[in-house]
Amino acid sequence: MGKIKRRAITEHEKRALRHYFFQLQNRSGQQDLIEWFREKFGKDISQPSVSQILSSKYSYLDNTVEKPWDVKRNRPPKYPLLEAALFEWQVQQGDDATLSGETIKRAAAILWHKIPEYQDQPVPNFSNGWLEGFRKRHILHAINEQPTESVVLNNTEPPNDPLSRVYDVTRLTNINDIFTMQETGLFWKLVPNGTPEVEDIKGITRFKARITLTVCCNASGTERLPLWVIGYSQSPRVFRAANVKPEVMNFKWRSNGKASMTTAIMEEWLRWFDACMEGRKVILLIDSYTPHLRAVENIRNSGNDLRNTTVITLPSTSASISQPCSEGVIYALKACYRKHWVQYILEQNELGRNPYNTTNVLRAILWLVKAWTTDISPEIIENAFNLSGVLGLFNESAVTSRALDEMIHPLRELVSEFSVQAAMRIEDFISPSEENIVDSSEDIINQIASQYMDDRAFETDEEESTEFQITTKDAMKAIELLLNYEAQQPDGNPAITISLLNYQKLLEARGGNVNLSRLRST
């Protein structure tokens, strides 16, 4: 896949894209919109840009009429990509009235060095005249707030007792309808005693072989929504080689130049979550991370609020309440993943292969999907909610569960084969501090600048893929093998046999009734 060259998208083009999308009776997928935009304007546009333009952040464009003289009056800026990035940075800062001219100029200079198109050019003199023009071109459009069903508790509210305020909401709700969501980074190639590797891509420092995971579950541990995985490439090499569809494999894939959560992705996630909760009234607990706050604000101001979800933004500085996922859920997920990864390393070493070269991001995600859907017990999730305090007074009897300890023990044994020291420092391997999500002004600038990086056809540190497409005939042979295996087991399970036979029937329909007798004889 060739590189996508970033070019500034004008307000006229954004308005046209929104108008085209929202007037469709059968809404197009984002790839269809990318093709439409290319044919219409002769430009390439990335999937994250499409998602952002369709978000409520640009809903003001729907309520304005483009006047014939607008194009002449609002002449394009000399540095359109810079101003687009700077405006996004300004929005992320909140009330632009608090930003001095010098602050905006400093941010412009930093962004200039990080946007690839400008890196070989000298930094302009950001004069007061330029500043005045920028402010005129990028007035923050106020949107009339509509009544909203969402309840948002955050650090801007009176600092009384955050525990009791959250509990006032959760105590009236069945625990099956109380959800939490949180992100974490993951170095999917990290080895015991290893350190995360970094790379500099045109002024933006980022980690190699890193993804961001978004996990969401309810307080009883009975519901775990599919993982959202954010990487660097819009379509990693291995996805194309294996012809995989992420949704079929129970995860969703998004991308940007920092492999991190953005306001646009978070807003998309919130609306997806709300659609998953159709017909219910649920509570969603999120933390006070800037993309979360901006996404919630965009939705509340859009006039198209969440229908089934009450959002509670947890205070980030409270000693009495914490994010449930931080109380063992994410740690358990990472521990399960590391166990699969270390087992793979040892197996590949025995075969004389380099596991660092033979693995890929798809295999890593499948280990994560397995860990999330089958390896983590409901007890770990329930215990995490009790420890967090979101369900009421802190439960002092809630301690790290035996299930979590039992999960870590086999990993420690495996890691000890590398070194005793690595086994003793198992926590640093399971969840290194560099994987923590950081919310800082420098991080915001890097996230914004990364949107203007050229798309890559592969993940960082991703080797040439050795994955191959599985034919229906291959799948049928595998089913036959599994049926025979299950029939030979002393504790064979009829339910498994029935499931395999049902899947076999599905394969027959897909493959045009492949001849089973021929399969058995080959």
UniProtKB/Swiss-Prot annotation:
Signal peptide position in this chain? none
- An MF annotation (GO) of this entry: chromatin-protein adaptor activity
| SMART domains in the cross-refs | CENPB
> Keywords for this entry?
DNA-binding, Nucleus, Phosphoprotein
Please name the GO terms of the biological process aspect recorded for this protein, alphabetically.
donor selection
Q: Spell out the InterPro entries in the cross-references.
A: CenT-Element_Derived, DDE_SF_endonuclease_dom, Homeodomain-like_sf, HTH_ABP1_N, HTH_CenpB_DNA-bd_dom
What pairs make up the disulfide bonds? none
Q: Name one GO cellular component term.
A: mating-type region heterochromatin
Location in the cell? Nucleus
Q: Where does the HTH CENPB-type domain start and stop, copy by copy?
A: 70-144
Q: Which residues carry this modification: Phosphothreonine?
A: 460
Functionally, this protein is described as follows: Binds, preferentially, to the Maundrell ARS consensus sequence within ARS3002.
Subunit structure of this chain's protein: Interacts with mcm10.
Q: What is the protein's given name?
A: ARS-binding protein 1
